[in-house]
Amino acid sequence: RDIGYWRDKQGHEIDFVINQKGRPLLAIECKWADKDFDPANAKVFLKHYNKAQVYVVSHNVSRPYSRRYDDFTIKFINLAGIENICKFQWGQNTQLLKNLKELPGKH
């Protein structure tokens, strides 16, 4: 499993990309507010990795929801939603989950 970021030569970027063998890539964009999300970078990313799942994480998302843009869908979640994705992808005892739980502040 690898955790990194993605950026192309034109400056499009994705905050976090999680790659696990045998699973679709997970692309995660972090935004202060979900209304601040611009799908342009995700659109370019998905042209290269069309099987990827893209999530926007924002503190103001009270319930997960999806939004359709052109020919792709983005899922909007809060920080607890990341924990749920990690549990689904890798089980309870992952280093990413441990790191998330060690972050200062409320979870």
Which residue ranges define each predicted feature?
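A cross-kingdom feature that marks ATP-driven nucleic-acid transaction machinery
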Residues: 1-107
